[in-house]
């Protein structure tokens, strides 16, 4: 950590958003949360992301080492006390204070506040140098955990896309519940209620409630995994259970392996890419056709 003067100007506790007496566990947790949000890999368009990430790393190194933290707290306390004293003084008293401190510095070779702060700063610099020589295992571990979490997030997004591209279309489920036609509450299942029940399993692309046939709806999920979880677990309201069944996109019990040209880590050819685009366009058209068909059937059904 090369820039000690800049470090002394920073409030490391405020930087991490923690209390001064926070334990090491709280310091590390705050570091992970802050570092994840400003990691350069996740903020390529932010020129200050790398600088802020470096400052957070410095704060972690100092605040998780007992000796370095004690030295930093001493400097911070001295600066805080000096700032509080200065704030209480008006302009005239500030001048008197400065004159008095000048005379005290001339009369005393040791013991002044400036010398105490200087000694504390020197101690802090020595502790930082020691940390740099020994290598901060804690910092390396926290940064490794951040990289691992970023990797897992990236893999999860890729898995969601793969589920959609490998299947015949986005998964759709049929929802049924008891509801009388004249029931304005729709049996307790408004659009907002259904979304709240279903979105916990994954992204919902579409939700269509039948206008003619009460107690019926179709939901379209972004991934097969989300649809599977909804079919397997959702029971709806206790006083009016919800029946969830497959309408389209139910996965096979066994899945055939993909063609060699589309193995993991390979790059799609131009023809493969065009086929994938056409498939997604067909899926969108089929989805709109299904919704229109359901609405048409509802309108044609006698009331």
Curated annotation (Swiss-Prot):
Q: Give GO BP annotations, semicolon-separated.
A: negative regulation of transcription by RNA polymerase II
Q: What is its main location?
A: cytoplasm
Q: Where is the J domain?
A: 11-76
GO CC field: cytoplasm; nucleus
- Where does the record say this protein resides? Cytoplasm; Nucleus
Q: What GO molecular function annotations does the UniProt record carry, in alphabetical order?
A: RNA binding
Region forming the signal peptide: none
Q: What happens when the gene is disrupted?
A: Embryonic lethal after the morula stage.
Q: Which residues form the RRM domain?
A: 178-249
Q: In which tissues is it expressed?
A: Expressed in the thyroid gland.
Annotated positions of the Phosphoserine modification: 112
Regions of biased composition (Basic and acidic residues) lie at: 150-166
* UniProt region (Disordered), positions on chain: 104-123, 150-170
Record keywords, A-Z:
Chaperone, Cytoplasm, Methylation, Nucleus, Phosphoprotein, RNA-binding, Transcription, Transcription regulation
Which positions bear N6-methyllysine?
264
Q: What does this protein do?
A: May negatively affect PAX8-induced thyroglobulin/TG transcription.
PANTHER family membership:
DNAJ HOMOLOG SUBFAMILY C MEMBER 17
Identify this protein by name.
DnaJ homolog subfamily C member 17
Give the originating organism: Mus musculus (Mouse)
């Amino acid at each position: 950590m090369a820039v000690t003067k800049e470090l002394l100007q920073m409030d490391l506790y405020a930087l991490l958003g923690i209390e001064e007496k926070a334990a090491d566990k709280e310091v590390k947790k705050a570091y992970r949360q802050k570092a994840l949000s400003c990691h350069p890999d996740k903020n390529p368009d932010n020129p200050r992301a790398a600088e802020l990430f470096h400052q957070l790393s410095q704060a972690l190194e100092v605040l998780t080492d007992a000796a370095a933290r004690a030295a930093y707290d001493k400097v911070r306390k001295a600066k805080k006390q000096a700032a509080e004293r200065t704030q209480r003084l008006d302009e005239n008293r500030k001048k008197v204070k400065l004159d008095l401190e000048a005379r005290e510095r001339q009369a005393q070779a040791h013991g002044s506040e400036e010398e105490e702060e200087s000694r504390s700063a020197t101690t802090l610099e020595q502790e930082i140098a020691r940390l740099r020589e020994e290598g901060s295992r804690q910092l390396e571990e926290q940064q490794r955990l951040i990289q691992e979490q970023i990797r897992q997030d990236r893999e999860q997004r890729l898995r969601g896309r793969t589920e959609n591209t490998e299947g015949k279309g986005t998964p759709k489920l049929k929802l049924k519940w008891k509801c009388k036609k004249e029931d304005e509450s729709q049996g307790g299942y408004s659009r907002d209620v259904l979304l709240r029940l279903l979105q916990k399993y994954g992204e919902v692309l579409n939700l269509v409630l039948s206008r003619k046939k009460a107690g019926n709806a179709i939901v379209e999920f972004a991934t097969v995994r989300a649809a599977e979880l909804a079919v397997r677990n959702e029971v709806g309201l206790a006083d009016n259970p919800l029946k969830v069944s497959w309408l389209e996109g139910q996965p096979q019990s066994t899945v055939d392996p993909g063609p060699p040209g589309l193995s993991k880590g390979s790059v799609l050819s131009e023809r493969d890419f065009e086929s994938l685009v056409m498939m997604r366009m067909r899926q969108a058209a089929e989805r709109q056709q299904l919704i229109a068909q359901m609405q048409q059937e509802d309108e044609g059904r006698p009331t």
